[in-house]
Structures are given as C-alpha cells and as structure tokens.
UniProtKB/Swiss-Prot annotation:
Processing after translation: Predicted to be exported by the Tat system. The position of the signal peptide cleavage has not been experimentally proven.
Subunit structure: Heterodimer of a catalytic subunit (MsrP) and a heme-binding subunit (MsrQ).
Keywords: Metal-binding, Molybdenum, Oxidoreductase, Periplasm, Signal
Protein name: Protein-methionine-sulfoxide reductase catalytic subunit MsrP
Enzyme Commission code: 1.8.5.-
Amino acid sequence: MHKHRKPTEADVTPESLFYQRRRVLKALGISAAALSLPLSAQADLLAWFKGSDKPKAPPGKPLTFSQPTDWKLDLPLTPEDKVTGYNNFYEFGLDKADPAANAGGLKTDGWTIKIDGDVAKPLTLDIDDLLKRFPLEERIYRFRCVEAWSMVIPWVGFELAKLIKFAEPTSNARYVAFQTLHDPEQMPGQKDRFMGGGLDYPYVEGLRMDEAMNPLALLAVGVYGKTLPPQNGAPIRLVTPWKYGFKNIKSIVHIRLTRERPPCTWNLAAPDEYGFYANVNPHVDHPRWSQATERVIGSGGLLNVERQPTLLFNGYAEQVASLYRGLNLRDNF
C-alpha cells in the first residue's frame, strides 16, 4: 500500500528527466539556488540560453456547434488561459508552459487523417471534410491528469463512434489505434531526446473497440468555441474524460482498427506506472504518488490551490462502469 502524500515536481516528472535537467543546468554554471527553483523556472533559465524567438499561433477560428444539455456540468470552467497555457505535449517540451511557447508554428492547413485497418471502407479525410460531415457539439467535461491535477474544459467536437461507423469496421476490429503526427522539424521534442522526454515517437495510443464506441469518447477540434490551439492538440485530438490525460492523444494523423491490442507510448516507456486502460481510479495509486485527491487548476496561482477527492472514472461511472464489469481494475490499471 502506498503512502498518500502530496506529489513534488520530482514525482510528477519521470525521475531520469528530473535529474538530467539538473545536470544540464549545472553544466551551464547555474547556481544551487537556481536549482532549487520549480522546474518551470528552471526551464526559463534554459530558454535564456536557447533563445525564444518562436512563431506565435494564429488566433483560433470561431466554430459553429450545438450545445446539448446532456453534456453540461454544473461546475465552473477552468479559465481559458490555464487550459491553453498549462499543458503536457512532450513533442514541444517537458514543462507545462513549453507547448504554448514552442508549438505556435505547427502547420495544420491541409491536415489529413487516415482511417484504415480492419474496415470495409478505408478513408483519408482532411480536416475540412470532417467538419462538414460530422456536426459539432460542445461538451463540458472533467479532465484529470495522471499527475493528480484536474480541469473542467468546454470541448467542441463529435463522437469518435461516428467516424468509426463511417469507415465500416469489420468483425475483426477489436481495438482502435491512434498515431500523432511525426514531424521532427515541427515538433522539436521528436528529435531532441532531452526536450522530448526520451519517449519513442511518434506518440501512439489505443482503446478497446467498446471504449471507442462509447458516446463519451470525443474527437475534439475546438475548445472555448474556437479551433484548437497547437498546444492543445490542433487540429484534432482524442478526449476520453474517464481516463487519465495521457490517453487523450493529440494532433492525430492516423486511426487504425485492429484485432490486436495496440502499443501505447507511456505504457511502453514505463509499464509499471502507466497502464493500457488508464482509467481514473482514486483507489489505485501511481507508484510514486496518491490518486485519492487532485489539485484543481483554477484562476489562482500556485499558492491558491484547492484539492478535492478524485472520483472513480472521473465522475463518469454511470456511463462507463459497465465496460469493465468483471475486470480487476487494480491489475488492469
């Protein structure tokens, strides 16, 4: 049984990356006092040496969408600047502010997404095709990171199930595999193992078919009523609100239906820490910190922190618990 304690930045950052960063800063002559700063402040010091002339992302374009009452939460939304400024997207850096700082030049014009594998109708659609073919709706979802922090986010998108049905899956299709864009020139973390966390790219994820067909599973193309900014996974990303955030793969270019369980990036990198299912569960701790509570990202700063109990399946048990009936959630984390 793991002791419940408040995670430190060394905890929520993989240990090898945490200490590698400190070695680099020491090699640059950074003082011991500077090394005691939070990782975000240390990143600012590194940025001083690297330069910070990064292109800014264009403003998001307004989207047309419905607002079904079924998907509204009686909870305050996380401020937009926190949703777009506090992100994990290692293709653009390890710190929470790195994606917003480094992803502005991501080119999404003419973006296509390929759907193939065990389907009767393989497809390649561009983002405009998707927006025309599948009506958009706003869904306000809880978002829970495996690092024990949470947000409430108004996504705009359409059900993943609609795209899968359009491709006509065969009876062999038991899983859905996803892949992020692989473009090291645009995504510097893919060519710099320090900047990209030492992960193997492209980033890949997967769901069971019944999970993918659940009405909660969303392909999001927008947030706060506008097209997604690059740091949030433009132009299209997965949102599965009952799972930890690392399952919510960003900047998708390929969806493949398959009979075999697909590989998943974090599960490959650290299988004892990041499971295939990644369902939010307050009773199953991460090996290095508790999942019983979560830090709510709100309008205040780091010193104005609210914690709340974590809900099983992130509060979506009524919609998804039946998917895992008879499954040991501790072993299949």
